Amino acid sequence: MTTVQIQTIVQIQAIVPNVGAYIPTVWSLAPGQKLGLALSGGGFRASLFHIGVLARLAELDLLRRVDVLSTVSGGSVIGAFYYLKLKKRLEERPLDANGEPVLPTSQDYVDIVAEIESEFLAAVQTNVRMKALLDPVANARMIFSDDYSRSDRIAEVYEECFYSRFSKHPGEKIPLTDLLITPAWMPRGFNVRQYNATSDFKIPILNINATSLNTGGRWVFTATDLGEVPSANPIGTIKPLPRISYSDPTLTPEQQKKLAQIGLSEAVAASACVPAIFTPLAIHDLYPRGANGEEIVVELVDGGVYDNQGVEALLSENCDLMICSDASGQLDGNRTPDIQLLPVATRSNDILATRVRAECYDNLRNCPGDGNFVFFHLRDDFPGNPTYPLLPGPVDRCNGVNDGHIYALSNIRTDLDAFSNVEAYTLMYDGYCLIDYFLQHDESNAGLGAPSPGGAPRRPWRFLAIRSMIKTDKQKLLSHLLIGKYLFFKPFYADPTRAWGVTLILLAPVLFFLWERFDLVVELYKLLVENILYYTLPAALVGAAGYAIVKALDDAPKMLKVFDFIRKYRRADNPLLIALFYAPGLFGAAVAFLNLSIYNKIFLQAGRLPPSDGDALLEPSHGPAQVEAAAQE
């Protein structure tokens, strides 16, 4: 945005006081100032919420001015997708009459988000979680292998569903070393930071955040390097694992080979590697072995363990202005907390996460300057206006009938399964309205529906169709949002008639066979319980106890040698073990296929929006008179 455009905005605000500030004066972004955007974790719930945020930032002409993009977990899934879209748009520019690349415009950024809105949701609705189980061989490898985990598998599915379309070489993953953006009008090897200091169209410095189990530090993947970010004021004695530049001439051939093998999808999988759900993502051979030949195995888990908001990266990059879009979970008050072992452990972990989140917010507040950050979350509300209706409160509870939509939305699962249109559009709409409200500090979201000052014309975003349901059928909307909290059996809540009907049809021949061959069932029961289980259960208990003892001696040199020996035979390419575990792998694949073929479709169909009632968008317009008319609507 130019100085003239900013002055025009200020003049409009003076003429039309009811409109409020489209972009606060502190966001005028003087030359050299850096704008940072943090996209929090929270599974696909967060990813979809952030799409609405990106849409409004593009309309307000701020998205092109983002210097630093920090992402965590679900924010990394969508952040990487946006980054690749932008990379493609900037590197593949059309040529003008003189054969020179045409410079991008603000409209390009709006168009990018419009493509993301439809393409990303389509990929989400394929049900990534279940697609990860479709390959029986991959399932078998995940059971026995020490170097192929659920995190490795989900990285492959991320690549297939989201990122493979951007690969220069079809069928190959995108390596981290290929992430650098070189706009069509710039020479290769240019200095991105120097370019950003003067350019109107920034190249965002992407920080994909994970957490190192080795040291407890923040691990970051960027387009130029990877590794741990040392603390400015360390208080412990653990030394962080050093950052490695992809272009470092001192790298060994083994390190260069490993860096070429690490793909963007692995970085995203590490960032979204929720502990206890996914196995830590392991990186072997990244660092040279120790003096005695000890291997350093980097083990990475979800970036949200360290900082689920992604704020630390913005502070490390010394951003002057910061936006944090927070779609992470919220801690509920509890009048009578459960005091059993597991609930106490879970509650304690949630309290710790809340404390870290509060510290991130405090760090933003303590930055120099006044009002140099925007922080909003899923339980914030916005006032709305007749054209852009608010989501009903209260924000801290829900009666399950006709209020508490914000609370229900904040409790939607943070899973990697399919999200219905109702769920996805409501999340996008909420992010869209919240970023508008918190940027403008306006009491009626007057800027929504009015032209974007200095920016691109607004678009008829698909997610705005949810406004019709908010206006006319709040009860039906709430019922959909309440179903969204369940991890399993959602089709049976969303459309019980179809789900149970299909289930009975599928079970009927099985039940008939069991009835006809009841004698066979009895014999099978005796074989499994009285013979196999009778002998295998004690052996399994003894084995588990032995394993626990061995793990307790994990640091003993002799035991480390034993583990290293076992790892040689637990490699993912061991054909004998693949054959041994193929049967359970095939069973998992069959369950996934059944879910995707039938139940996933039932859930998505139940969550479709009803036909539009013609709730049209405001047409783009220009000038104070049109802005005032929109504000007074």
Locations of the language-model features?
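Catalytic domains of lipid- and phosphate-ester/thioester hydrolases
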Residues: M1-E633
